[in-house]
Swiss-Prot record:
Subunit structure: Homodimer.
Pfam family, any one: 14-3-3
Source organism of the structure: Solanum lycopersicum
GO cellular component terms given for this protein: cytoplasm
Family statement drawn from the similarity comment of this UniProt entry: Belongs to the 14-3-3 family.
Stated name of the protein: 14-3-3 protein 9
Superkingdom field: Eukaryota
UniProt-listed InterPro entries: 14-3-3, 14-3-3_CS, 14-3-3_dom_sf, 14-3-3_domain
GO biological process: protein localization; signal transduction
Source lineage: Eukaryota, Viridiplantae, Streptophyta, Embryophyta, Tracheophyta
Region (Disordered), start-end ranges: 239-261
Length: 261
């Protein structure tokens, strides 16, 4: 059994790594804590999440940039450059796959078995949904179908736990609804489902705004605004009858949604 001193040291190293923007080392430090098979504190949980978010985020950004350049080169007929870009994309995709698989192992083998609180259960299942979604962003064919299905199951498990354990205004429940709706819009190509989920979460939170915890007011209202922004973007993709059902949500140009991470 690892000592509390070791745990404290890993957490401190993770905080240092975050300040120094050395996110790979931040992840390693927090993985060491997770591997102790202890229930993480809110602070530890957030450190782990921030580390992985940055490690995967830089690769997702790289992938998007390279994909955009690839499209431009294809339109110009520069086959040699397209070939070079495809090879580079494969490298980034391999890194993304490894990072996402890595966090899945940590969640499934250490974090979920060690957690008792409903909030943590929602948090970890949401994380699984997010990282399978990141895989679905670049996978194709059956591989995409498989990770999309796993993402859906994780988001559904998180939603079931959230509805049982967390208030509609809780930032983790709202963040889950935000990311789950992005999954429907971007991965499942279902703007109707995305809008329904986002609007339902927004409306339920609005109805309980008076009971909003002062500590989480800023986080909750920020996510509610993101839900609203996405609804504004997405309603222009709906058929007219479905759009009417959104009860006056403003329309704007269609585009990808913002997610909580």
């Amino acid at each position: 059994m690892a000592s509390s001193k070791e745990r404290e040291n890993f957490v401190y190293v993770a905080k240092l790594a975050e300040q120094a923007e050395r996110y790979d080392e931040m992840v390693e430090a927090m993985k060491n804590v997770a591997n102790m098979d202890v229930e993480l504190t809110v602070e530890e949980r957030n450190l782990l999440s921030v580390g992985y978010k940055n490690v995967v985020g830089s690769r997702r950004a790289s992938w998007r940039i390279l994909s955009s350049i690839e499209q431009k080169e294809e339109s110009r007929g520069n086959e040699q450059n397209v070939k070079r870009i495809k090879e580079y994309l494969q490298k980034v995709e391999s890194e993304l796959t490894n990072i996402c698989n890595d966090i899945m192992v940590v969640i499934d083998q250490h974090l979920i078995p060690s957690c008792s609180a409903g909030e943590s259960t929602v948090f970890y299942h949401k994380m699984k949904g997010d990282y399978y979604r990141y895989l679905a962003e670049f996978k194709a064919g059956n591989d995409k179908k498989e990770v999309a299905e796993l993402s859906l199951k994780a988001y559904q498990a998180a939603t079931t736990a959230a509805e049982a354990e967390l208030a509609p205004t809780h930032p983790i429940r709202l963040g889950l609804a935000l990311n789950f709706s992005v999954f429907y819009y971007e991965i499942m190509n279902s703007p109707e489902r995305a809008c329904h989920l986002a609007k339902q979460a927004f409306d339920e939170a609005i109805s309980e705004l008076d009971s909003l915890n002062e500590d989480s007011y800023k986080d909750s209202t920020l996510i509610m605004q993101l839900l609203r922004d996405n609804l504004t973007l997405w309603t222009s993709d709906l058929p007219e009858d479905a759009e009417d059902a959104q009860k006056g949500d403003a329309t704007n140009k269609a585009g990808g949604g913002e997610d909580a991470e």
